A protein has these predicted regions:
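Active-site substrate-recognition loop segments, prototypically the cytochrome P450 B′-helix/B-C loop
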Residues: 1-123, 233
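Residue-level recognition of short, solvent-exposed, well-ordered loop/turn junctions
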Residues: 192-193
Length: 289
């Protein structure tokens, strides 16, 4: 395994790639402690059955990697994930952060329509389910915030902010993988071509340097100018289903706030055991009068 200054190995400890490294809805404090030691750590090949990889934990570094695909290439094939050189994508869909400045569908070459559908549709059911479950769980865990949202349910800016905070706090996709294309340095650690990198979105979204008191669910966090969370990636390779996820989550929130009574836990939730997806196998809920 690599032995490089500034990147202690964590193969002897329980790595954040383990499914049980995340309590329901709140990242394990192991990520916070590890990030305080180093922004980049080495995960050995025993991690979640994956080959060894560098784990990037800090918001600024994760965002940098997401916005430089000419250095950090997605580990996928197909025309929607073609190489990017000189700031221009070849066979890739250019999109802006949601809400888009232009109709992103119109920006996809006609010959790639099938690939667009093939990339987006298979991921929607599971990702949407995890997103909605995570948003609901945030409200179940914070009944006081739910009550305050109900009192101000006509405040569109607050509702929009609450949707973003649900996404940040829960982070339905825990990590994404990249391959280093050319030598670079992240967090003081040299990375070599061909090495794998796990970008921990959940760690970046709970980085206290970017989001004060990151473990707190604060629906008004994004009302004022704030750094965007990284649930959907960043730049022209951001998630193509971002708008759809936001629409569904907002619709669920509005419907819950308009309904008399309030959701309450109806039993212990059973988390999905995955090192990449953040969701539930079961989330029992009852409705109180």
């Amino acid at each position: 395994m690599p032995q490089r200054r500034g990147a202690p190995a964590i193969s002897t400890a329980r790595p954040p790639g383990r499914a049980d490294a995340h309590a329901c809805g709140v990242p394990h404090d192991r990520l916070e402690r590890l990030r305080a030691r180093t922004p980049v750590a080495w995960l050995d090949e025993r991690t979640a059955g994956q080959p060894g990889a560098w784990a990037v934990l800090r918001y600024s570094d994760v965002r940098h990697a997401l916005t430089h695909p000419e250095v950090f290439a997605p580990q996928m094939g197909g025309p929607l994930h073609g190489p990017v050189t000189g700031g221009e994508a070849h066979g890739a869909a250019h999109i802006d952060m949601d809400p888009p400045a232009r109709d992103m569908l119109a920006r996809i070459p006609s010959g790639e329509a099938v690939d667009f559908v093939g990339e987006v549709v298979p991921e929607l059911p599971e990702t949407l389910r995890n997103t909605l479950a995570g948003g609901l769980y945030a409200l179940l865990r914070h009944p006081g915030e739910y009550a305050r949202l109900r009192e101000r349910q006509d405040d569109d800016a607050l509702i929009d902010s609450a949707v973003e905070e649900m996404l940040r706090w829960w982070t339905p996709v825990l990590q994404v993988w990249r391959t280093v294309l050319r030598a670079t340095t992240v967090g003081g650690v040299p990375l070599l071509p061909g090495e794998n990198v796990a970008l921990w979105l959940v760690s970046a979204n709970h980085d206290g340097e970017t989001f004060p008191d990151p473990g707190r669910f604060a629906p008004d966090r994004f009302v004022q100018a704030a750094r965007p969370h990284l649930c959907f990636g960043f730049g022209h390779r951001a998630c193509l289903g971002a708008r759809l996820a936001r629409v569904h989550l907002r619709a669920m929130l509005v419907a819950l706030l308009e309904r008399p009574g309030a959701p309450r836990p109806a039993g212990e939730p059973v988390p999905l055991r995955s090192s990449a997806r953040h969701g539930f196998v079961h989330l029992p809920v009852r409705w109180s009068d």
